[in-house]
């Protein structure tokens, strides 16, 4: 099937993407002190030069004391980190690409001993999980407002250094998603209980980001059913419930939904072939990004279990068919782009035989 659908421009207000190929956010941990360096700049520049229309950066921590959970991940606060990101922006723009930061708070995933302040524990919606296990500092309402303010400031900073929008990380069992999920949200106030109440934190956060950046500055929201704490978890079981969950987020100011799945080809609900991005587009009318093992014959978790496994390039025929049918608008590519910065150009040129396979070793280097 012709690949031209991947390489058509995409327009959303003032945002113009040269192609439908999106670089998925992937934690890389190559920014000592939280500052993106020359290797990080070149890493992103190479993808833009080879035909990636939109780069969503690796997760970048907002300016809250408990936002970070891992060593050497980049910050999105402070003079040095923002100056580093400005260099990344300029390099990507010079190649004709667009770029947004993924704004991130890890929540209860954080552990005592983590930089930058080792004394700070993880923060979560409530100190106990559904099974009663005490895991974190349960957030007060003041804590909630502090985190919301940190996201709003990060978005404003992104706009000021020339980023083309922002993505809010609301997926995979990190803080925003911890509020969504009843397994981690045991609050009894207006931020807990029903899914509508558990969504209140995200809604207020999105509203604050929108107020900080004004109209016309794109806000992408990434969400998932699955959690790193439970890969079988599901926030909703039916299309109706999905629509009820997403509409308030859309109304709060989301422009594009990034629908995270482990395998893009899997139907989200019985009775339809639509995946999560397809249903989200149908229910909200907003553009969507699909993601999940694009371009490879094996999903990510297999490489955590079997370190010798190699994922070979896979056919894009089913992906292109869905894209041509307007099931979704944009396609996020993760590991295939991580290992091969020229992936998009090779696909465009019909050089599939030259695409590099993925192995776990690729995670250890920045190319």
PLM regions and their residue ranges:
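Flavin-dependent oxidoreductase catalytic cores
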Residues: 1-367
């Amino acid at each position: 099937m012709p690949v031209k659908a991947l390489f058509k421009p995409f327009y959303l207000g003032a945002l113009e993407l040269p192609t439908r190929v999106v670089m998925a956010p992937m934690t890389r941990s190559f920014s000592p002190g939280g500052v993106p360096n020359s290797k990080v700049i070149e890493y992103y520049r190479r993808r833009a030069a080879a035909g990636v229309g939109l780069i969503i950066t690796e997760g970048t921590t907002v300016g809250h004391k408990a936002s970070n959970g891992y060593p050497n991940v980049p910050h999105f606060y402070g003079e040095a980190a923002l100056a580093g990101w400005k260099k990344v922006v300029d390099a990507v723009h010079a190649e004709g690409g667009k770029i947004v930061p993924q704004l991130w708070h890890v929540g209860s995933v954080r552990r005592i001993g983590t930089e930058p302040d080792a004394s700070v524990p993880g923060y979560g919606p409530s100190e106990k999980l559904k099974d009663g296990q005490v895991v974190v500092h349960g957030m007060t309402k003041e804590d909630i407002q502090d985190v919301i303010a940190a996201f709003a400031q990060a978005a404003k900073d992104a706009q000021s250094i020339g980023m083309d929008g922002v993505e809010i990380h609301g997926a995979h069992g990190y803080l925003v998603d911890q509020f969504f999920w009843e397994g981690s949200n045991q609050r009894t106030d207006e931020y807990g209980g029903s899914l509508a109440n558990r969504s209140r934190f995200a809604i207020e956060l999105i509203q604050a980001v929108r107020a900080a950046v004004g109209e016309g500055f794109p806000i992408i929201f990434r969400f998932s059913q699955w959690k790193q704490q439970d890969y079988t978890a599901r926030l909703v079981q039916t299309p109706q419930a999905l629509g009820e969950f997403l509409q308030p987020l859309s109304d709060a100011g989301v422009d594009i939904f990034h629908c995270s799945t482990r395998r893009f080809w899997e139907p989200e609900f019985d009775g339809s072939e639509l995946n999560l991005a397809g249903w989200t587009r149908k229910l909200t009318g907003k553009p969507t990004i699909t993601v999940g093992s694009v371009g490879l014959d094996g999903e990510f978790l297999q490489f955590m279990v079997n370190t010798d496994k190699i994922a070979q390039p896979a056919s894009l025929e089913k992906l292109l068919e869905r894209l041509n049918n307007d099931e979704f608008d944009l396609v996020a590519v993760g590991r295939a782009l991580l290992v091969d910065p020229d992936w998009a150009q090779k696909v465009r040129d019909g050089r599939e035989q030259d695409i590099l396979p993925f192995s776990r070793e690729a995670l250890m280097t920045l190319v």
